[in-house]
Amino acid sequence: MKLSTRPHRGVTRSRILATFAAAGCAAAVLTAAGPAAAGTAAVRTGAAAATAAAATARATAVNGRIAFSQWDLLPGGNLAGPSNVYTINPNGTGRRQLTHVGKKHAAGAPDWSRDGTKIVYESNQTGNYRIWVMNADGSGQRRLTNDPGFMDLQPAWSPDGRHIVFSRCTTQPGGTGCDLEVMTARGTGMRRLADDHWSWVHAEYSPDGRQIVVAADRGGFLSALWLMRSNGTGLHRITKPSFEAFWPEWSPDGSRILFTDNCCQGGSNVWTVRPDGTGLRKLTHFSMPLQDGFASYSPDGRQIVMQFNGKCPARGICKYLYVMNADGSGLHPLRTGVPFTFLSDWGRASS
């Protein structure tokens, strides 16, 4: 069963969440063994040598905490509120809850600022989904957007910390998709980079701030990665729609783009590609019912944190965080102590 990534008329959060949080697949199809079995699953590694990202990442980068979303589950694997933003050390210790939005609300999709001092995220704690920002310890939580008739989702920082790019999806009758918007870090100066003729989801600035990569869906179930200048010009596609690529993220040195292919075609997997669309490389090799994705590089480019789907006793389907080397080797679980964790972002240690 596939769910469209495109929010059509009368957009609902549950429809968008089906792609963002559930990797575009009904959770009921997942009957894989839990994390213990996943750690020993037959996973063919990528190239033996480290990827270009790991080989050339700046030596000054220091890996900090991993931010992630946590959802509660109902029996059978159905999503239920609340969800909140947490952080954890790369070795699985020191889990810390940053948001407390209440039983009927949600906060998630965290993205670290480049200096490791702030996190931008989405939340519906005051009604519809808006963009929020907070300090790395969870203090200073502040709403940045509040326009009626829209859901604001999937925020990401510019490298200099001055701007935030995000998806704005209409909830009005007749709405056709999601705009791509950018604003200042204070929530002012909003302008549109791409209109809602398509659905633009999860954009990311390049490390030098000159380009933006974004997943776009032009109806049906087809999604591809597109590249544009940071001012919205020069739009061009870098992956084939047949990949149904989503959730892109740049390597710290800008040489590769990490992404996930869509599930239900034999399992979802993590790939990388060069910004010019060449050098496509598959890092994981799962087959249904195993799935992984929604991956993020460590600040030094040597590792990747990602979501892995598995079965948990008496709870239905669970999603765990796993870490692997940048070449796809060394896959191992990150023991978060919670059964449903996803949409992670690996931050840099603040100075």
Locate the predicted segments by residue:
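Secretory targeting and sorting signals
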Residues: 2-42, 47-49
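Sequence signature of WD/YWTD-type beta-propeller architectures
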Residues: 2-3, 39-351
